[in-house]
């Protein structure tokens, strides 16, 4: 496997785990000298310490412009995961009965946010409810 693909795999696995656990990614100080560099960098470091393939290609051994650890790359991978998850939900739905649930509320910084959920009957006849996402709502007044 190419070094790029191995780095990408390590980043994707790290991101998937953090998403499944509902943990934040970034730290306040991600410099190499920092003791707490954030969950993403810390978990990627742990993976590289325990997997010889990853340890050969991540961080210092990766080219400076291709470490696949920047916030932009993290967001791109997160968006790809979200698209694949939505696709899996739609396949599970199988074109059956569904409802869209929407609820808005102001977050801690007083910005309006809307949660979108999908309730549907899956292929097994079970009622499922899945969060599709949380979106910023610029104005709640018509």
Task: Explain the meaning of each model-derived region.
Residues 1-139:
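Extended, charged coiled-coil/helical-stalk scaffolds used for oligomerization and assembly
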